[in-house]
């Protein structure tokens, strides 16, 4: 059920006409929240499955510009979820380290892809590099915070 909800939230951008930057930060935060909640309620294996499905659906929705970026996003999502698991006992590290590590990994890997493909358009290169770094950091951080708020409210029920 959590995987279906995450994929539905990711598809909101197809029906909700938001400007691209707003869509990126809103949908990205919700998707990261769902990665965290899936890990929390269904375990690491299910969260890793979701981590692999999300970039595929994003590509099919036209949100990933190059197919070679799918493994970059896979790697970032997997690292994010695994670090959540490893640092779950330390709330501060779990809040900051997974988003930071994901953003760094994706930024470096996207740089490699962009240079291997040798995109001729500098604006496209910058767009890809930005999208694979700063928004990942911000939306992952917000997603963890949102997931904690949801988790605390569910625990009160």
Briefly describe each language-model feature range.
Residues 1-157:
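Loop-helix junctions at membrane interfaces
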């Amino acid at each position: 059920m959590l995987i279906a909800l995450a994929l539905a939230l990711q598809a909101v951008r197809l029906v909700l006409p938001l400007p691209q930057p707003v869509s990126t930060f809103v949908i990205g935060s919700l998707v990261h929240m769902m990665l965290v909640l899936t890990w929390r309620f269904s375990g690491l294996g299910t969260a890793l499955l979701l981590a692999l499905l999300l970039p595929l659906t994003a590509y099919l929705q036209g949100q990933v510009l190059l197919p070679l970026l799918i493994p970059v996003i896979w790697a970032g999502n997997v690292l994010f979820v695994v670090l959540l698991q490893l640092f779950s006992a330390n709330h501060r590290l779990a809040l900051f380290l997974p988003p930071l590590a994901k953003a760094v990994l994706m930024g470096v890997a996207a740089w490699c892809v962009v240079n291997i493909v040798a995109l001729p358009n500098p604006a496209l290169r910058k767009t890809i590099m930005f999208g694979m770094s700063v928004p990942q950091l911000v939306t992952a951080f917000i997603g963890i915070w949102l997931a904690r708020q949801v988790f605390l409210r569910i625990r009160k029920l």
